[in-house]
Design a protein with these regions (language model features):
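Cofactor-binding active-site loop characterized by glycine-rich and histidine/acidic residues
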Residues: 23-27, 31-163, 181-187, 192, ...
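Short, ordered loop/turn segments at secondary-structure junctions
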Residues: 66, 172-175, 207-208, 236-238
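Flexible loop/turn segments at secondary-structure boundaries
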Residues: 69-71, 148-149, 176-179, 211-212, ...
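Ligand/cofactor pocket segment of small-molecule handling proteins
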Residues: 163, 175-225
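A glycine-rich helix N-cap at a beta->alpha junction
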Residues: 165-169
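Structural signature of the thiamine diphosphate
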Residues: 211-248
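Single conserved hydrophobic/aromatic residue that forms the stacking wall/gate
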Residues: 257-265
Length: 265
């Protein structure tokens, strides 16, 4: 894919910033100097940055409780994100949301949700209003592999196809739904096959390859807008941290835990 120098610099800067930020947050979590749970996205940076590099800056997105990377890639202010994690009034949500609930409507960040699969219905609403009002903004909702078992996801997917709205369901398949391996909770060979139930177009890609993520997302956006239809994207990757900071990860086989390192973005 052709990427100009400015975009390449933006991609590198965002990848580096997210990793540095999360490693620092991880250290802070060990020191127990912030309230509440912290969920880092170390290992998922390529998905955050790749998808956001394909979206316009004012497009709509929603995130999950593992939202720091999405927020940074969406150009939310680092100082405001950090203040929010500390519960300060200067935080992006005035300190009321904490780590799991980052939002900034001015940047197109409709919200990060501590409840699994709470984002798809919200982004569906954004996509529907764009269609009704003749808008051109794209709408994308980030979910994890565990979210596909939640009713809210299926309701949003069904209505998105019924109403033919252009939006993206971006699934970060990081091999574990909390402590449950994908092979133990998924009854299809490939996670993206879930979309067949809704006659939805789907793509699959390497979540550790930022350029592949970006290209697949660009192609999906073009197709989604041209056909006025939702599209399901599955990006396979691996989270190097636990489900939350403090998770001992005893449920993970050593082979799985160490093998992704050479593919680390």
């Amino acid at each position: 894919m052709d990427i100009d120098a400015d975009k390449l610099y933006w991609i590198y800067k965002k990848l580096f910033t997210i990793r540095f930020f999360e490693e620092r947050i991880k250290k802070i979590a060990v020191e127990k100097s912030v309230p509440g749970y912290l969920h880092t996205c170390i290992g998922s940076e390529a998905i955050c940055v790749g998808v956001m590099s394909a979206l316009d800056s004012d497009d709509w997105i929603s995130s999950t409780y593992r939202n720091h990377g999405h927020s940074i890639a969406k150009n939310c202010e680092l100082k405001e994100i950090t203040s929010e994690i500390y519960g300060r009034r200067t935080g992006i949500c005035k300190g009321r949301g904490g780590s799991m609930h980052i939002s900034d409507f001015d940047k197109g960040m409709l919200g990060s949700f501590g409840i699994v699969a709470a984002g798809p219905p919200v982004v569906l609403g954004a996509a529907l209003q764009e269609k009704i009002n003749g808008g051109t903004k794209m709408s994308a909702t980030f979910i994890g592999d565990g979210a596909i078992h939640n009713g809210a996801f299926h309701e949003a997917a069904g209505l998105a196809k019924l109403w033919d709205v252009p939006m993206l369901f971006v699934c970060e398949n990081n091999a574990y739904a909390e402590a449950t391996a994908t092979d133990w909770h998924l009854n299809t060979k490939e996670l993206k096959d879930i979309s067949k139930a809704y006659d939805m177009i789907s793509y699959q890609g390497d979540g550790n390859n930022v350029f592949e993520v970006s290209q697949i997302t660009r192609d999906a956006i073009i197709e989604s807008k041209a056909k006025s239809t939702p599209i399901f994207l599955e990006f396979k990757n691996y989270r190097f941290s636990g489900q939350y900071e403090g998770d001992t990860q005893l449920y993970q086989p050593c082979l799985l835990y160490t093998s992704p390192s050479p593919r680390d973005s």
